[in-house]
């Protein structure tokens, strides 16, 4: 029988096309996985027979193919089983077979082994053992295959296999940061993916509990309710992986940003005012993944307990409801929560209060998972349950652990239904990397760390403030509710206050405490916005902020919540510069609150000048050294710069006020990350654009800029710049900046135009529409330009260039980068901005240029 490769290749292609057509018409994932296996079985059997292999050999499917599941672009894993080592002629024939695999268009992974070699490999590698466990004979010697299966099964130690697979899962979880909620999860390998389901079946098969959900149910491994849930999750993940393979025409199991929107549209999701289509898709994914991780934990613990009955320890009674088994919390009665729903929250209190407990037994987890249904409106209204919930919030230890456990088991979202709505909700806003519920728990974790002595070195100011705060547990309540209204459309800070007030009243908080928590939720973004976007040297800014906070308690609570919130957004968002800005605002506000008076411009200037003169004396400079420079500076300069900066500028410039050459001075930032840079030169229209271009080329991002023109026509500009690549070479960069920037300004070299660089995939696939607004400031002398745009190389240069073209003059710039998102504020004047048409023209042009 000859091998017609072309005919087989055509058959493979036709089968694949027919499978896709059938799936699109029926939406039957199980049928697709089964039918693809059957089609491949048929093709491989034809190929095997056409090459006239000896009857002593066997061809078997292994891995997912052996299990009977072949996704559209899955690899096909084969085992060619030999009775003894292959002869030279057989080896040649096997090589021809492998060549034909590729010729007919199948991606095949294969191994050629004797039975003994299979057993040896299985003993050394748990992955090989797992693949062989699912072997299925395709064609060839049935007796040889039966011998292989019998010996493989005879060598299998179910307990050892269980422990190895559990360890393998732990290692896999570590590769994916131990979370199902990553921005771009792998629907096969990530926690909560298909692999978690397969692990259950592998262990069940090795232990003889069955290879279907129904068989696991019959053998008491899984309950009816859990079986229904797992079947639903498995079906969802199967469909997702199938659609991903068909959409891309190749094997790809990662839900990359590049695919999420297209896949969401494929599922019929439509973007609305509250959520992008991709966010809706991912919320469904995360909720399924969460269910899989919970049930995987329960079922693995259950099978582990069944495999080691002799290791059962004598329970130690904790109270009427609970006992300790080993170091795990166990319920004394399987029907505890049905009989006494009050015990649901007591379970988490027991975990919080008992230092010796490290987890819960499988039956406790299972009972709690089932007990979610007991959390009804009546349960939520019960004073005892409300008291227990408040006790959890007020605990001395284990707060974050237990709230995470409650969230994982679905208890938290049932007790607080509005929290349940944001579980698994991702925010494709270019800076959040956690789902809303995970972000809230991160914020609670940060607040908890402020109270712990072992983290005092990391959060010194926060640790001191929280130790002074009365009833610091109120911050956990504020954290729990600060983002609870995300995804509803509208202002989540405002909408969240309604939920917060209702919770506080229902849970017996005093009027004073309720007012504080509601105020924190309403204003949780304010301190961050003031610190990062407004001029903290302006007494009016500080006075307005003090009017909002009112007293020390509100200021301290808001500072702590703001710090915890920013750090809980993304590891990339926080840096020491933002920490310094927040601390500066806090210190200025607390100083004036303690003095009982709002800051006044004349008092601030006198204080700064006196302090600057005191600092100058340390350098053995005369008492009048400052006079020549300061005569050229107006009050705005002294309001915008600290005493330390004023002294530095004076020290550097007092002897060259009329210098013909530019003066550039740089130094490590005295109060945070990065470098401080001062530029002094005769003023010119495009100076800011030139400087921005230089820093962009040098790999530095400007986070703060103060632009000033002296009375005699010199620019005195100050910058704080951060190294994008975080290189540890400040000394070399100081010398480089001072020399290179001076030379470029002196010789009027062509402007450095920053390279456009590559956009991140996140920016590319979830672009945000630029927002630009220009409004007059409160004094009526300047205009405030605010913009929000996707961050990218050259963004600030684009803004500077556009302002120059429109004849607008820049006074200050506050540059805030939140992950991949830029939120910048500029104080500008000139350019006929008092004319409404000119303002609109500048806004329109900026929006056009800032589009991705």
Curated annotation (Swiss-Prot):
Keyword Coiled coil part of the UniProt annotation: no
Molecular function terms, GO-annotated: [protein-PII] uridylyltransferase activity; phosphoric diester hydrolase activity
Region (Uridylyl-removing): 318-675
SUPFAM superfamilies membership: ACT-like, HD-domain/PDEase-like, Nucleotidyltransferase, Nucleotidyltransferase substrate binding subunit/domain
Family: Belongs to the GlnD family.
EC number: 2.7.7.59, 3.1.4.-
Keywords attached to this entry: Hydrolase, Magnesium, Multifunctional enzyme, Nucleotidyltransferase, Repeat, Transferase
An annotated GO BP: regulation of nitrogen utilization
Functional description taken from the UniProt entry: Modifies, by uridylylation and deuridylylation, the PII regulatory proteins (GlnB and homologs), in response to the nitrogen status of the cell that GlnD senses through the glutamine level. Under low glutamine levels, catalyzes the conversion of the PII proteins and UTP to PII-UMP and PPi, while under higher glutamine levels, GlnD hydrolyzes PII-UMP to PII and UMP (deuridylylation). Thus, controls uridylylation state and activity of the PII proteins, and plays an important role in the regulation of nitrogen assimilation and metabolism.
Transmembrane segments: none
Chain segments carrying region Uridylyltransferase: 1-317
Reactions performed catalytically: [protein-PII]-L-tyrosine + UTP = [protein-PII]-uridylyl-L-tyrosine + diphosphate; [protein-PII]-uridylyl-L-tyrosine + H2O = [protein-PII]-L-tyrosine + UMP + H(+)
Organism, scientific name: Dechloromonas aromatica (strain RCB)
Domain ACT: 676-755, 784-852
Protein's recorded name: Bifunctional uridylyltransferase/uridylyl-removing enzyme
A Pfam family reported for this protein in Swiss-Prot or TrEMBL: GlnD_UR_UTase
Regulation: Uridylyltransferase (UTase) activity is inhibited by glutamine, while glutamine activates uridylyl-removing (UR) activity.
Name of the gene this protein is made from: glnD
Record remark: domains: Has four distinct domains: an N-terminal nucleotidyltransferase (NT) domain responsible for UTase activity, a central HD domain that encodes UR activity, and two C-terminal ACT domains that seem to have a role in glutamine sensing.
Keyword Nucleotidyltransferase included in the entry's annotation: yes
Cofactors, names only: Mg(2+)
Classification via InterPro entries: ACT-like_dom_sf (IPR045865), ACT_dom (IPR002912), HD/PDEase_dom (IPR003607), HD_domain (IPR006674), NT_sf (IPR043519), PII_UdlTrfase/GS_AdlTrfase (IPR013546), Polymerase_NTP_transf_dom (IPR002934), UTase/UR (IPR010043)
HD domain residues: 436-555
